[in-house]
Amino acid sequence: MIIKCSNDELDIVQKIQANIFCKENTKKLLDMRSSNLVPLTRIDFESFDSHLINLSNGIYALGMTHMLCFTKTVSKVNSIINSLVTLEEAA
């Protein structure tokens, strides 16, 4: 998936990758899901992997075992978390 994001948005994405999408935080994510804050159906934390590749200034390729789509414009971490959607297969 190709995303375009500002430096602030990239910083937020990297913080999310470091703090939210790790196996140790499964309970936190499931708690948010049970509170209907996150529209996620399933994430396989055993096989989850993600990375950002800088293609050019402000444009990044996001590669994941389970692809996650989120809104292009975000102002805080919650707005990204609330817009995550799990996809079974990458298109």
Curated annotation (Swiss-Prot):
Organism: Rickettsia prowazekii (strain Madrid E)
Protein name in the entry: Uncharacterized protein RP052
Origin superkingdom: Bacteria
